[in-house]
């Protein structure tokens, strides 16, 4: 009887760990949003056949730009794509698998798929710089064509942005 309870507890913990490790939309935003948008564009008859899904995806990719275009390139949806893992998208879509799960599978095949990110537009007048990631602080400086020599910690980047803020916030108005 104790063994049975132990098996149930271990099974529950394994499920709990698996759900906490599941891919979130913000971890792979371009993939999730593109797959959702593509899936919504398909009619019911196309959704059932993975070959038709692949053909529709290639047609869909011809109209995409920027990050979505790069996503299509990684999957093999473009003529100039070097590799093709399109069946990793089309078959799960034909099974009605959610976009997050599809992107999780795609990430296992090609990690750079989830490295694609949309550019964040940061309003410096309303944002709390302390809550931003260092990557976003570096992006602000990079957008201004400024550097932060010797900046190692988040506080250093915030200090540099605060120094330059008057110069750039006036020109944006």
Swiss-Prot record:
One of its GO terms (cellular component) is synapse. It is found in: Secreted. Pfam families: ARMET_C, ARMET_N. Residues 1-22 form the signal peptide. Disulfide bonds join 28-114, 31-103, 61-72, 148-151. It comes from the Eukaryota. Its main location: secreted. Keywords: Developmental protein, Disulfide bond, Secreted, Signal. GO terms for biological process: dopamine metabolic process; dopaminergic neuron differentiation; neuron cellular homeostasis; neuron projection development; synaptic transmission, dopaminergic. Required during the maturation of the embryonic nervous system for maintenance of neuronal and cuticular connectivity. Essential for maintenance of dopaminergic neurons and dopamine levels. Belongs to the ARMET family. This is Mesencephalic astrocyte-derived neurotrophic factor homolog. It comes from Drosophila yakuba (Fruit fly).
